[in-house]
């Protein structure tokens, strides 16, 4: 049986990449593959600081070198330097096929000459945003393929959902439940990338018109002072609102909660394929999101923050969209592995 190594943030980390990679890992295990996972983050969150993470990442080639030979090394790693480091160390991988998955919008990333160099070393490139593979520069289009990140869990239940969150979602009292999740990303490029302020403003407007509840989830710890100030501002605005539950840095999966939600709101300023949107649709939950990238069939989209509350109301009042089956892309990844190994 083929040996596979997945290099990625993994659960209990928070976010779509860790969720998708974790499901890929466990599905491969259940299907009899000899698969290992290298978590690029620490299970103990207090160690997830730049110096410690850099040191952990530095050890990856040594981990590969001192383990029995892998046939495929599949990397789900963010950033320029991480991809470059993995590629430069390819000679120690004992002939393993190297696969990179690009999560998010690939266009800004591949404008970087170091990323292009790193990707040229890969045997296959997976783009989660449909259409990105055809837009890869030069000969990278020959290596690239579109495979969205959506992989369904084999079992969907609330086993790992904290009781306080489950109680908030279940005890509706006739009110409508909105779910939002995002990271506190504020930098020179993005002011509130995930749209916390847009979500709170829309919810405040909706509260004057009807009975709503909001489960607001913060993914991870803010990475700079601006992010910390954003969360301080947001928590100050919702501090006395009993209709809002703010959850900070708790590792659990969203998928089971979509069974209780009326609308999942994703007001991001940029995006990839968005695992959570496909999960919500698969659980027959309505989705409201920005129109900045190609979205799956069945979502409600808006153009500007001023439209968000109105589009949420429209989604509430609309008939559920025709059921759109969400393809589980796990099988596509297995087929890619098989083709890679057949060409070895």
What are the residue ranges of the model-derived segments?
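Donor nucleotide-sugar binding/catalytic pocket of nucleotide-sugar-dependent glycosyltransferases
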Residues: 120-165, 180-182
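Aromatic "clamp/platform" in nucleotide-sugar-dependent glycosyltransferases that forms part
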Residues: 269
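A charged, aromatic-enriched C-terminal amphipathic alpha-helix characteristic of glycosyltransferases
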Residues: 160, 303-306, 316-344
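Nucleotide-activated donor-binding/catalytic signature segment of Leloir-type glycosyltransferases, i.e.
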Residues: 218-220, 228-249
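Short hydrophobic beta-strand element within catalytic cores of glycosyltransferases
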Residues: 277, 281, 286-289
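Conserved donor-binding/catalytic core segment of Leloir-type glycosyltransferases
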Residues: 168-194, 200-203
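Short alpha-helical donor nucleotide-sugar binding micro-motif in glycosyltransferases
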Residues: 119, 251, 256-261
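Glycosyltransferase donor-sugar binding loop
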Residues: 40-42, 181, 213-230
């Amino acid at each position: 049986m083929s040996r596979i190594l997945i290099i990625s943030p993994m659960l209990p980390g928070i976010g779509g990449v860790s969720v998708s990679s974790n499901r890929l890992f466990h599905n491969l295990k259940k299907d009899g593959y000899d698969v290992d996972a290298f978590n690029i983050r620490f299970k103990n969150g207090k160690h997830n600081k730049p110096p410690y993470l850099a040191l952990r990442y530095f050890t990856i080639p040594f981990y590969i070198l001192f383990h029995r030979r892998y046939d495929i090394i599949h990397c789900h790693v963010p950033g320029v330097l991480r991809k470059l480091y993995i590629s430069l160390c390819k000679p120690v991988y004992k002939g393993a096929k190297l696969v990179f998955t690009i999560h998010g919008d690939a266009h800004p990333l591949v404008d970087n000459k170091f990323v292009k160099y790193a990707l040229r070393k890969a045997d296959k490139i997976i783009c989660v945003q449909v259409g990105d593979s055809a837009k890869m520069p030069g000969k990278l289009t020959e290596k690239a393929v579109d495979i969205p990140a959506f992989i369904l869990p084999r079992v969907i239940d609330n086993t790992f959902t904290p009781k306080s969150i489950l109680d908030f979602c279940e005890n509706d009292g006739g009110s409508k439940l909105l779910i939002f999740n995002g990271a506190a990303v504020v930098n020179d490029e993005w002011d509130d990338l995930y749209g916390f302020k847009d979500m709170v403003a829309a919810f405040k407007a909706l509260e004057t018109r009807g009975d709503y509840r909001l489960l607001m989830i913060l993914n991870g710890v803010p990475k700079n002072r601006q992010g910390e100030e954003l969360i301080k501002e947001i928590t100050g605005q919702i501090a006395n609102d009993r209709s809002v539950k703010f959850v900070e840095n708790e590792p659990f999966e969203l998928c089971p909660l979509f069974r209780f939600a009326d609308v999942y709101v994703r007001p991001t300023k940029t995006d990839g394929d968005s695992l959570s949107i496909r999960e919500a649709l698969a659980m027959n939950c309505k989705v409201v999101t920005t129109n900045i990238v190609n979205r799956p069939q069945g979502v409600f989209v808006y153009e500007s923050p001023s439209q968000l509350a109105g589009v949420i109301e429209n989604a509430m009042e609309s008939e559920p969209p025709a059921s759109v089956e969400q393809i589980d892309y796990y099988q596509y990844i297995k087929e890619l592995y098989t083709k890679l190994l057949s060409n070895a």
